[in-house]
């Protein structure tokens, strides 16, 4: 039975992917910053599938060398998901960018050392169109880091660029393949109390902390589709060497609020004029 290493096992996307992998017959080893959260992860995954004999844990830190080689040892595939998400401190370069870049360096080196078949990275559309003012983007587009972009966009762009630079550097020296998944805003049910950064938008619309909507459009994708894409990226023969934008549709915030209101939630009905959108930050 093949085994997959999943970094950052307590996260929104990770929990759905771990469930998917076990359902498909793969054993999983996942990393946590603290093993104190082990039972939390087990309880979350057990909502979808039995973890008996299929899930094991290790403790890792994106900023520390210790344990990475041992974590990946014996694994056939790597799903590297662990990366800092935007918080109230997301303007701090050291909090967001440094762990993202150093984390993928450590994970790639461990994967290479352990002869992993394929390395799948969770990137983001933030690495695709985070600075250019275009109406359409594809997998050839990259965020221009010479422009004024947020640390989160910088973190995702630099981390993914490191992946492809690493693969180019080791071309012909390893059989390991690589794939990047670039999700947009990921919505859907969470398996734990960690609802994910994207779902915080929905939470703020229904808990009253955002008293108005802005006429801003966002691209969205369902969490189950994101998990499925990570799985297919791992097994599909046509996936290696490519980046895949995971985005299904787009919606304006007033549309999202209407869907929430139509389904019994109390979302704001007041729409802020577009010219004020730049003044307010959500």
Model-derived features with residue positions:
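Active-site Tyr-X1-5-Lys
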Residues: 147-178
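N-terminal Rossmann NAD(P)H-binding glycine-rich loop of SDR-like oxidoreductase domains
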Residues: 4-26, 31
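Glycine/proline-rich active-site loop of Rossmann-fold NAD(P)-dependent oxidoreductases
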Residues: 172-175, 188-201, 233-244
């Amino acid at each position: 039975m093949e085994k997959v290493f999943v970094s950052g096992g307590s996260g929104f996307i990770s929990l759905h992917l771990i469930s998917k992998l076990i359902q498909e017959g793969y054993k999983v080893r996942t990393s946590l910053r603290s093993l104190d959260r082990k039972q939390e992860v087990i309880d979350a995954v057990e909502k979808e599938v039995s973890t008996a004999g299929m899930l094991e844990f290790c403790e890792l830190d994106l900023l520390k060398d210790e344990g990475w080689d041992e974590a990946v040892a014996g694994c056939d595939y790597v799903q590297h998901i662990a990366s800092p998400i935007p918080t109230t401190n997301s303007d701090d370069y050291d909090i967001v960018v440094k762990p993202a870049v150093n984390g993928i360096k450590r994970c790639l080196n461990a994967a290479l050392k352990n002869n992993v078949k394929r390395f799948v990275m969770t990137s983001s559309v933030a690495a695709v169109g985070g600075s250019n003012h275009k109406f359409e983007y594809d997998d050839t587009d990259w965020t221009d880091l010479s422009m004024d972009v947020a640390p989160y966009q910088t973190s995702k762009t630099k981390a993914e660029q490191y992946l492809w630079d690493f693969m180019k550097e080791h071309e012909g020296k390893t059989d390991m393949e690589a794939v990047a998944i670039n999700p947009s805003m990921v919505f859907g049910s969470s398996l734990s109390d960690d609802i994910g950064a994207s779902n915080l938008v929905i939470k703020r619309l229904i808990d009253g902390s955002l008293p108005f909507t802005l006429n801003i459009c966002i691209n969205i994708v369902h969490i189950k589709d994101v998990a499925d894409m990570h799985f297919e990226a791992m097994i599909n023969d046509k996936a290696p060497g490519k980046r895949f934008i995971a985005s299904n549709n787009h919606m304006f915030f007033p549309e999202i609020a209407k869907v929430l209101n139509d389904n019994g939630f109390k979302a704001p009905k007041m729409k802020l004029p577009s010219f004020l959108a730049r003044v307010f930050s959500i």
